[in-house]
Each structure stands twice: as structure tokens, then as C-alpha cells.
Amino acid sequence: MSKKEVRQAAAELTERLCEKDFLDRSGLSRKNVMMLMNKDHWEEQFAHIFPIKKRISCRAVYEICEEPLSLLGHEPEEGWMKFTYQYVCHILYPDAEFKKENAAFSAGAEFYLAVLQFVFDRERAVLPYKPMEDFAFLGDEEASSFECAAEYSRFKKFFAQEYIYEMMRLNAEVTPFRTLEHIAGVHYVAMTVARGLYAAGVPIDLTLTSGAAAGHDLGKFGCKPNERVPYLHYYYTNQWFNNHSMEYIGHIAANHSTWDLEPENLSVESLVLIYADFRVKQSRGDDGREITYISNLDEAFNVILSKLDNVDEVKLNRYRFVYSKLHDFEDY
């Protein structure tokens, strides 16, 4: 990338940070932003990552932001990356006590998140799409022909506004989990199946499918440390969608448990999401970190069976029944 293009990138980021929306949510003034966006610093640092040829880590972006962040005062005890991950989770699931206790660090977290989003937007524009690492959302023109287009537009707006993708990327670096890989993988499988059904003439709403698949596990980021994620994340997923007035997408997203297959009157969008969630599994490597993969139905059956609590003959038969419905769907 030429010096001119590097200068242009730095100028575009500065312009984005000077917009009223960012200034309002960060509490920074335009003068503060100009102090953080020292021209020489950003042009020197951007020359190291542009042109983008591979995925840029949150750590690499933090190292660029480290010096400007120091101008805002001391860093959080847990460091800026871990704190910003906690902070962005509380954007989705606000907590008055957390906000009050960490008010001194909110501007820094907002700044880091905005820079992450800027870099990841540029990354997305030049790198090949990877199904386990990002989302191929419907464009506005394609989405407009479906019934849930308005809700889907809201979903995409809040997905960006609340830094949900950036949250998932941080999650992969500051925790042992690979939640992004699972959610993105489920979205990929669901949309592959949904597009195939749509092409075959099956009446399916692609906006409903995409929004529900991309949002189906958002509740995992709302669960508190002492809460059982496998049981409560459905509740928190539903809460997020309800708080943003997305009733239809939220209903599909929150009801994606295998047991939700038991009712007979299941929508095709629900069936597609449950099928995709069933297929995209995670195991743990020797280092304790999650490994995401797309399994076949038989493998997925055994993985989920091993995780079920209090399995007796009645519960096993229920599980076999819902599994058979997925097999019938796949055969179809």
C-alpha cells in the first residue's frame, strides 16, 4: 500500500471517530479524538498492517492502540483486551453496577472497539470469505423480497452498532472458547440449506433464517459466571431480541434446542436452524481450547447424547425421536 493510501486509511478512521454517534457514546470530544489520532503514529502503524494479506488479530490492533489509549489514563487491572471484551458483553446485556464501577474506562473501550471494527471492515473487503470466521449476510436488495426484511435490517444495524462481531473476535483471543466459529458455522450451514430449499421452490424466508442463525447463541454472552450456559443462553438470546423489537427472528433464534423439534407445527426456518446447530460441533484440543467442525448427523447424535443430563429410557426415546426428524429432513 502506498503512503498515500495509508494516509487515506488513517484519515478515514479519524473521520469515523469524529462522527456524532461515536462522540456521544464514548463521551470524547472532537479535540480528544484528534489527540488520540496523532497523524505520524497512525500512518506509521497502519503501514505495518496495510495492505491486509491475512486476518488481523485483536492483539495486533491493540498494539496499535496501546499508545493512544495510554493518553486516556491508566489501563484496567485485567488489561484493555479482557476489559473491552467484558465491556462489549455489557453493551448487549447492560448492568448498572458494571457501568458505574468502570466509567473511567468506557471511553478507551469504545475507542478500541471502533478501531477493531474499522480494521475488520477493511479485512472483510479484501480477504476471501471463510465460513467459520465471518458472516455472509444478505444485501439490502436481496433481503427486500422477504417478509422479515425490516426486522433483518434492524438486526444488521444492531449487529454493527453493538460491536457483536468484534465481541466474538475478542472472545476467541481472551477466553478458551471459539464461539464465533460455532455461530458463523451454524449460519453458513443454515444458509446453505436454506438457499437450496429456496431454489427448489420451498417457501422459506432467508432473512429470518440468516438473522436467527447469526443470533442464536448471543445469549451465551449474557450468562453470568455462576449460571449454566447450556440451559440459560436461550433465555438471554430471547431477551436481547425482545429488547430490540425483533419478535419473529428472536422466536426462531431462541428456540433452537434439539427438544424444540418435538412439536409437529415447526416452521421450516426453525427446522433449518436446529439442523445446522446440530451439525456444527465443538471438541477440545490438548491445550483446552475449542475446535469447531461440521459433523455428520450420526456423529452429532453421539456428541449430544454424551452431554445430556439424567438420561433414562424415556429421555433416550425422546432424543431418538427428534433425531429421526432431523434424519428425515436431511433425506428430504
Region spans (language model):
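An amphipathic alpha-helix signature
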Residues: 161-165, 187, 191, 238, ...
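Divalent metal-dependent phosphate-bond-processing catalytic cores, especially two-metal-ion Mg2+/Mn2+ enzymes
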Residues: 2-154, 174-204, 215, 225, ...
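Active-site alpha-helix of zinc metalloproteases
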Residues: 208-212, 221, 252, 272-273
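Helix-adjacent hinge/juxtasegments
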Residues: 220-264
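A short glycine/small-residue-enriched secondary-structure motif
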Residues: 162-167, 207-218
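Short alpha-helical hairpin
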Residues: 150-168
